[in-house]
Swiss-Prot record:
This is Leucyl/phenylalanyl-tRNA--protein transferase. InterPro entries: Acyl_CoA_acyltransferase (IPR016181), Leu/Phe-tRNA_Trfase (IPR004616), Leu/Phe-tRNA_Trfase_C (IPR042203), Leu/Phe-tRNA_Trfase_N (IPR042221). Belongs to the L/F-transferase family. The gene is aat. One of its GO terms (molecular function) is leucyl-tRNA--protein transferase activity. It catalyses: N-terminal L-lysyl-[protein] + L-leucyl-tRNA(Leu) = N-terminal L-leucyl-L-lysyl-[protein] + tRNA(Leu) + H(+); N-terminal L-arginyl-[protein] + L-leucyl-tRNA(Leu) = N-terminal L-leucyl-L-arginyl-[protein] + tRNA(Leu) + H(+); L-phenylalanyl-tRNA(Phe) + an N-terminal L-alpha-aminoacyl-[protein] = an N-terminal L-phenylalanyl-L-alpha-aminoacyl-[protein] + tRNA(Phe). Gene3D superfamilies: Leucyl/phenylalanyl-tRNA-protein transferase, C-terminal domain (3.40.630.70), Leucyl/phenylalanyl-tRNA-protein transferase, N-terminal domain (3.30.70.3550). Functions in the N-end rule pathway of protein degradation where it conjugates Leu, Phe and, less efficiently, Met from aminoacyl-tRNAs to the N-termini of proteins containing an N-terminal arginine or lysine. It is an enzyme of class 2 (transferase). Its main location: cytoplasm. It is found in: Cytoplasm. Keywords: Acyltransferase, Cytoplasm, Transferase. NCBIfam families: aat (TIGR00667).
């Protein structure tokens, strides 16, 4: 019978993932901290923090794991039309804290409260400052109406949370992000647990062991993110020079069809 392990504050190592509980699925360890070093260590092995106010820090590695290949994103006819005609401007890393705050405060059906605590917000904001965590923002007439954030390690993007305040905002944002990740050579988007919404984009569940093998292959790869050169995306009608990886700042408006 598996038993939860309390993490040592001075030791970044996690217990083997096969020791995670089956009920609740994937609960692996308790305690530790949200330091950048521990978070990078955890994500590189497919482990992520998920807990609510009043709970101890909980670490998870569910089995199966839901993942999406950026190159295999499904875009139906309605979404392709929306991508050609949407009224939004999409940016990256221009309002990370605002996106994370919105993800933590927006009301969601079937959920009471949020798992995005102030401690979590501070930790991921620091990762963004370090160039490890990134956000995508969807704007409508200078108002933030949608977005998402996550962690980028090698050629894997670990999605954390998303929000939408108007119809179509999250679909446009997520689709554009996946296209950009594909252009940059990313192999995998970690969606953590099953979501019907993400399944509509082509996300699928795979065994945890398979997921971990994919991480071992791709977490240490170097993505094709431009550093000094001007990047021209096939999606937008406007773009601007892309700074180094520590700042993915770019902007899109409605553009060409995505096949």
């Amino acid at each position: 019978m598996s038993q939860l392990q309390w993490l040592d504050a001075d030791n970044l190592r996690f217990p083997p993932t096969h020791s995670a509980l089956r009920d609740p699925d994937g609960l692996l360890a308790v305690g530790g901290d949200l330091s950048p070093a521990r978070l990078i260590e955890s994500y590189s092995h497919g482990i992520f923090p998920w807990y609510s106010d009043g709970q101890p820090l909980l670490w998870w590695t569910p089995d199966p794991r839901m993942v999406l290949r950026p190159a295999h994103v499904h875009r139906g006819r309605t979404l392709r039309k929306l991508l050609r005609q949407h009224p939004f401007t999409v940016t990256v890393d221009s309002a990370f804290d605002a996106v994370a705050q919105a993800c933590g405060t927006i009301e969601r059906e079937g959920q009471d409260g949020t798992w995005i605590t102030q401690e979590m917000l501070a930790a991921y904001s620091e990762l963004n400052r370090l160039g490890v965590a990134h956000s995508l923002e969807v704007w409508l007439q200078n108002e933030l109406v949608g977005g998402l954030y996550g962690i980028a390690l090698g050629t894997v993007f670990f999605g954390e949370s998303m929000f939408s305040r108007v119809s179509g905002a999250s679909k446009v944002g997520f689709s554009i992000l996946c296209q950009q990740l594909e252009n940059w050579g990313f192999e995998l988007v970690d969606c953590q647990i099953h979501s019907g919404y993400l399944a509509s984009f082509g996300a699928q569940e795979i065994p945890r062991a398979t997921f971990e093998k994919l991480l071992a292959q791709h977490v240490w790869n170097i993505p094709r993110v431009p550093s000094a050169a001007c990047y021209q995306s096939p999606i937008p009608t406007t773009s601007r020079p892309c700074p180094p990886l520590i700042n993915w700042q770019m902007a899109w408006t409605a553009g060409e069809d995505l096949a």
